[in-house]
Every structure is written in C-alpha cells, then in structure tokens.
Amino acid sequence: MINKTKRLMVSRQVKIPRKTYFWGPTPNPGMHPKDQSVTLLSIIRDYLKLSDKEREAARILANGLVKVDGKTVREKKFAVGFMDVIEINGESYRVVYNDQGALVLMKETKERASMKLLKVRSKVIAPGNRIQLGTHDGRTFITDDKSKKVGDVWAVSVPDMKISEIIKMQPGNKAYITAGSHVNQTGTISKIEAKEGSSANLVHFQEGFSTIKDHVFMIGSSKFSFVLSPEEVIP
C-alpha cells in the first residue's frame, strides 16, 4: 500500500501549494490526528521556505537543527499540531489556527517558547486506582490527583512538561476557539449550558457568541494569562 496523499486531497487545515507537486506530505502516526497536523517537511519547505526540495529539508532535520517542544526531531514526516513549539535556526514558532481554521505558525519569543498549554481530553482509572489523563497532543499523564478534569488546560514547561498553572473551564475565564465558525477568536466565558441527551454542551461568551464545549481551549484566568493574538503569522 502506498503511504502517500495527493496534494489536492491534503487536509485544508494544512496550508501548502496544491498544484506544485502531485504528492503531498503524509504525517506519520503520532501525537496529533492526521487531519489536524502538519509534517516538519511542510513546515521547513512550504511554511518557512527554508528549502526548495524535500532532500534539502531532510538534510536540515538530519543535522539536528529542528526541535519540537524542546526535543530534537530528525524525522521529516513527524506530525506537529496546535500549540506545538518549533525551534529552528534560532527562531521559535508556535502552531496556531487562522480565521479559516488552517494551521499556521506564530513567531514566539524565547521566553514564551519555553511554555506550552495542554488541554485534558480524557480521564480514566489506571491500575492501582490511579488517574490516567490524556491531553490534546496525545500525551498521557498518570496522577493521584482526582481534582484534575476533562476540559482543564495546563500551562507546562518544555521539554520537562512540569505543570505551573491549571486553567479551569468556568465562567470568568478566557478561552481560544479551535474550530467552527468562531475559530481563532478569543473570549471570556459567561455561561456553560449543559444539554440533554447526546447534544453537545454549549459555552456562551461575554463577547456575544457561543460554541460547543469541544471547541473551547482555555488560555486565561484571574491568576494567569496566555496571549494568542499573533501579529506575525506564517504563511
């Protein structure tokens, strides 16, 4: 089976030229879902324009010049997604969304690049009656702290992933929208509306819009704020 994707069929969340080549880059299975991730090959060649050819991009990676979340990565099909921090040639970038829901790069300072936000996506009981938590970027954490909830967002340091702040999904706290018609907007939660049955819970914002709970990514509280208003976005 050919592990390739036609460029015209690549997810619209990936901003690459559609007609330059026949085949498009296919991410390896990894931390982020295939349709919500971009390969490092695309980041180097199509986003940052640091190479013209795949071979040149592969050489940059092979030389250990690229880090993701503080760790060196050499695989050209390595998948990066929302909130990942990429360091290359002394510059740092964070993967965010634009107004069309496509993944883009936001330039970061070195200080801010040392931090990442993780959203808790799942919570299950692990062996030994411990708690296993899964985050939006595919990481797994084992803890005895039962107070941590799905929907919480953690501010962690990279690369050691130590939690410095926990932002709860609750009225008064600030959030970033990751999908839907309000993608790439920020707002302050006014109310969380629980729906009956299989309907998705709604989150209402002081700014006058609403979205489903799954699209809400917390970024601020009364004690902590993480600004996502990129002035320089690539491409």
From Swiss-Prot:
GO cellular component terms, semicolon-separated: cytosolic small ribosomal subunit
First and last residue of the signal peptide: none
UniProt xrefs under Pfam families: Ribosomal_S4e
InterPro entries, per database record: Rib_uL2_dom2, Ribosomal_eS4, Ribosomal_eS4_central_region, Ribosomal_eS4_central_sf, Ribosomal_eS4_KOW, S4_RNA-bd, S4_RNA-bd_sf
Domain spans labelled S4 RNA-binding: 38-99
CDD domains per UniProt: KOW_RPS4, S4
Family annotation (NCBIfam families): PRK04313.1 (NF003312)
PANTHER family in UniProt: 30S/40S RIBOSOMAL PROTEIN S4, SMALL RIBOSOMAL SUBUNIT PROTEIN ES4
Family: Belongs to the eukaryotic ribosomal protein eS4 family.
Name of this protein: Small ribosomal subunit protein eS4
Source organism (scientific name): Thermoplasma acidophilum (strain ATCC 25905 / DSM 1728 / JCM 9062 / NBRC 15155 / AMRC-C165)
Lineage: Archaea, Methanobacteriati, Thermoplasmatota, Thermoplasmata, Thermoplasmatales
